[in-house]
């Protein structure tokens, strides 16, 4: 019994000594921390706020960028065209995601030689919501249209991401190239808003397969948009790795040397119209056009007078320029409609 009491007393004293030594070490360590915070507390606080905001933005970036469920039921119901030739198509991407497409067929004169437009929509809704715009393209431009629902949108599977959208666009282009009933020498890309960034990426990687691109009310990059939308915080100083989605169109446009049409609505309240002008200026294309619509809003520029005329003139110019003599010429202009 006496031996057990002595052992317990020894252990108790040892634990007390260890606690006392640990507390002394804590006090010694605390001193430089107090001094550092006293001297640099403001800077440390700013850094903590900066890192916290960057972390929150990174985690919730997809929620801030992709809106596949707006308007409500967009994931459940996709309107289909009626009374016109069309196909409801499902294809698989290289990573196994099932995508839904709608092909609108032009059936008028010389339909076999009609251009095909691959249509990339914005960050909300589904392809069915773009049918009013697409049907007017079909009638006015005499083209085939393939409307694309990205992964996570409409009836397509998966979840949206930057890399995923790039894979989707590549899969759609590959699919178009397998269609013997579509003229592969007249493939046009059209992208509005987020779709413009997808179109620019696809064009930058496939210049040999794409005749021309047409982008409308799109942005330079997500970091540029973050600086615009969150101007109260110095977002421009955030490094690129803080952004889960980047969509660096201002860099990728340098690889798009095919004829390019930039469509800008000056009444766009979401994406600054100056970004469209900057993309136009950054474009190295020999044939490039900037069509400006003073009354054009972000989603409804296509309803402005002269919109389809601008697209029609551009498409005709591109088709005509297939001759090597025409392609050798460099031309650019700005049209205000």
From Swiss-Prot:
It comes from the Eukaryota. This is Protein ABHD13. Keywords: Glycoprotein, Hydrolase, Membrane, Signal-anchor, Transmembrane, Transmembrane helix. It is an enzyme of class 3 (hydrolase). The chain crosses the membrane at residues 37-57. The active site is at residues 193, 268, 298. The gene is ABHD13. InterPro entries: AB_hydrolase_1, AB_hydrolase_fold. Belongs to the serine esterase family. It is a single-pass type II membrane protein. Glycans are attached at residue 299. It is found in: Membrane. GO terms for molecular function: palmitoyl-(protein) hydrolase activity. The keyword Secreted does not apply. Pfam families: Abhydrolase_1 (PF00561). Its EC number is 3.-.-.-. Residues 115-222 form the AB hydrolase-1 domain. GO terms for cellular component: membrane. It comes from Gallus gallus.
